């Protein structure tokens, strides 16, 4: 190949190729800086892009898991609140039964205590029946267990229902007394109901703690997945900024090199003047 040719300027061609390469790299860096992503699409790195997309899908699906677990929390919280009310009512029922067991009471006083007892009993039914969250209850005896999403694979966190109705506590809608002796017997019955209620509430409390712990774990898992996706996809902006400055300088030098290479043709022409 001729060293000096007006038909083919090899120096200019090489300079142009280098400038095009630099410009392409510069465009890529500018895109990474503007988007904040080092992997913008499958064409950038198919394997990493696919992995990141799968991880991102898993992280996003955990939102449904968290929603389900939070419903579980609320359902248990409502049952625990109802249970707290019910144990208070049972305590008051015991108080009325104990007072009514006093054989020295007048008939009017006894009847007043019985009426109070019956009213408190009926309030237990109302508290248990209304212990619903979003129409669902684990305290009214309508279900034996409830399952909530535990992970993105569809596995379940199961909570065993605890019936806090009169029947679930060993009482009936007609539990009462008509004599002082019957009132004395009722004291023991209420004590048993109280023990049953507190045992069931303790069990629900354990379930609530377990659900809270799992919800915390799921939240941390989602954060870890999001961080992993970020590590795979996000650009190092400090590094890209330094790279941008370097390529901009390289581009300017490339333009100068191309200008110098193009001037060689003019130099050859001057030889013939």
From Swiss-Prot:
Entry's family note: Belongs to the bacterial flagellin family.
InterPro entries according to UniProt: Flagellin (IPR001492), Flagellin_C (IPR046358), Flagellin_N (IPR001029)
Protein name stated in the entry: Flagellin FljO
Annotated organism of origin: Caulobacter vibrioides (strain ATCC 19089 / CIP 103742 / CB 15)
Localization annotation: Secreted; Bacterial flagellum
Transmembrane segments annotated in the record for this chain: none
Pfam families named among the record's database cross-references: Flagellin_C (PF00700), Flagellin_N (PF00669)
Function: Flagellin is the subunit protein which polymerizes to form the filaments of bacterial flagella.
One annotated GO molecular function: structural molecule activity
Complex and partners: In C.crescentus, the flagellar filament is composed of multiple flagellins of 29 kDa; 27 kDa and 25 kDa.
GO CC annotation: bacterial-type flagellum; extracellular region
Keyword terms of this UniProt record: Bacterial flagellum, Secreted
């Amino acid at each position: 190949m001729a060293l000096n040719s007006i038909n083919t300027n090899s120096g200019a061609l090489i300079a142009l190729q280098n400038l095009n390469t630099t410009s392409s790299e510069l465009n890529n860096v500018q895109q990474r800086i503007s988007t904040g992503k080092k992997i913008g699409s499958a064409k950038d790195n198919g394997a990493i892009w696919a992995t990141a997309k799968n991880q991102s899908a898993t992280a996003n699906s955990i939102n449904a898991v968290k929603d389900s677990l939070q419903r579980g929390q609320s359902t248990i919280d409502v049952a625990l609140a109802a249970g707290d009310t019910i144990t208070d009512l049972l305590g008051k029922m015991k108080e009325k039964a104990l007072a009514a067991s006093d054989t020295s009471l007048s008939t009017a006083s006894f009847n007043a205590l019985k009426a109070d007892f019956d009213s408190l009993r009926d309030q237990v039914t109302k508290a248990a029946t209304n212990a619903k969250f979003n129409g669902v209850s684990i305290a009214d005896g309508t279900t034996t267990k409830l399952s909530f999403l535990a992970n993105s694979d569809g596995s379940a966190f199961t909570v065993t229902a605890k019936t806090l109705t009169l029947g679930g506590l060993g009482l009936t809608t007609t539990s009462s007394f008509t004599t002082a002796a019957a009132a004395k017997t009722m004291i023991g019955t209420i004590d048993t109901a109280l023990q049953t209620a507190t045992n069931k509430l303790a069990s629900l409390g354990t379930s609530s703690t377990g659900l809270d712990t799992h919800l915390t774990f799921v939240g941390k898992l989602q954060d870890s997945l999001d961080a992993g996706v970020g590590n795979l996809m996000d650009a190092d902006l400090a590094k890209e900024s330094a790279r941008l400055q370097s390529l901009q300088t390289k581009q300017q030098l490339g333009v100068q090199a191309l200008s110098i290479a193009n001037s060689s043709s003019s130099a050859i022409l001057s030889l013939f003047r």
